[in-house]
Amino acid sequence: MSEELAQHCIVCTSPSKTFNLAGLVGSYHIVYNSWWRDRMEKESSLSHYNMMNVLSMHALIGAYKPEGYEWTDELCEVLTGNIDFACDYIEKHFEGVTVSKPQGTYMLFVDCTDWCKAHGKTIEDVEHACWDVGAAIQDGTMFFGPCHLRMNLASPRSRIEEAFHRMDKYVFNA
């Protein structure tokens, strides 16, 4: 990155999602421009909230060691497998339900518009039916999908498979 670009960039990052460290304060920012850096440090220190502590500092250091890189590679393999499984399962078993493979996230955005129309159901009906059989999903309306579900695929494959089998048997093909 050029020096000129560095003076106009602020990078905010964290190991929270990748390493499941959200309960620890580990976010940080990289700011080359001293005026912006001083201003950010002043503003962020006013509440004394989100200040890194000894435990979070060591968690951050551990996450960014070579073992953390290996773990991240394995995590990406598991998540990719879960995404492939979910997308294939939806395509083969949930007629009227469509999905696009996500890029860079483990959240699946599922379009149930055609299925709901064909079965006279609302997305709320689908959401409640999924929860009733132990498949934890989220209404996609807040993400501008009026008849969409949002599914978190960051779980062991066995849990993902069980949830999809339940949705198949008790929700989409009941």
Residue ranges and their predicted role:
Residues 1-174:
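PLP-dependent class I/II
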